[in-house]
Amino acid sequence: MSETLVLHLKVPTERFREVLSSLKEKQNFTASPSSQPKPQERPFQMKKPRAPYGMGPRAMKRREKAEKEKLGVVNDELAESSKPSSGAATPTRSAPKSSAGLINSGLRALDRSGKPCRRWEKKPISIRSISTIVWKLPLWIGTPDSIPNTPELPVKTTLDSVNEIAAALSTHAESSPMDATSPVDSMPESATGI
């Protein structure tokens, strides 16, 4: 909603004519080419309409690049199949070489204390049961020189310790009010499949 404002001014006609003539003179003065050189107006240039999504110049370049890579991979595969294998395969993409120095170079920023890395060794460990069955299992153990101040716990492997364990089990079985049964006997028949 636009509102129009009308003003009624009471101005003598002579004064009104003077104001109009002064305005016309100012317009003629600015419009005269001899007073000021006017810069040439450029014709109105319309902007290009925006390309639809996925059809712009960047998208077209990406699409062309992907097609070239795809064709390059296909051409390399065809070339490799026609050539006899020389032992070393050349990958189409550059991959890092798998040397220990390159793999661990990214890990240097993690530890800057200067402490040497802990070395791990695979050593067998033997576990002996009460029934004198011995199991030998592989175990990863850190080197003792790199373990800071960790006391080793003494392990009793003598026959006395086996006797102590057997005595403890027998006293536990005697103190229980129920008869000692095997785990299979206490299971329901449906679970055992009998």
From Swiss-Prot:
One of its GO terms (molecular function) is DNA binding. The modification Phosphothreonine is found at residue 90. It is found in: Cytoplasm; Nucleus. Residues 24-107, 170-194 are annotated as: Disordered. InterPro entries: INO80_su_Ies4. Keywords: Chromatin regulator, Cytoplasm, DNA damage, DNA repair, DNA-binding, Nucleus, Phosphoprotein, Transcription, Transcription regulation. The modification Phosphoserine is found at residue 86. Coiled coil: none annotated. GO terms for cellular component: chromatin; cytosol; Ino80 complex; nucleus. Pfam families: INO80_Ies4. The keyword Chaperone does not apply. GO terms for biological process: chromatin remodeling; DNA repair; transcription initiation-coupled chromatin remodeling. Component of the INO80 chromatin remodeling complex. Component of the INO80 complex which remodels chromatin by shifting nucleosomes and is involved in DNA repair. This is INO80 complex subunit 4. It comes from Schizosaccharomyces pombe (strain 972 / ATCC 24843) (Fission yeast).
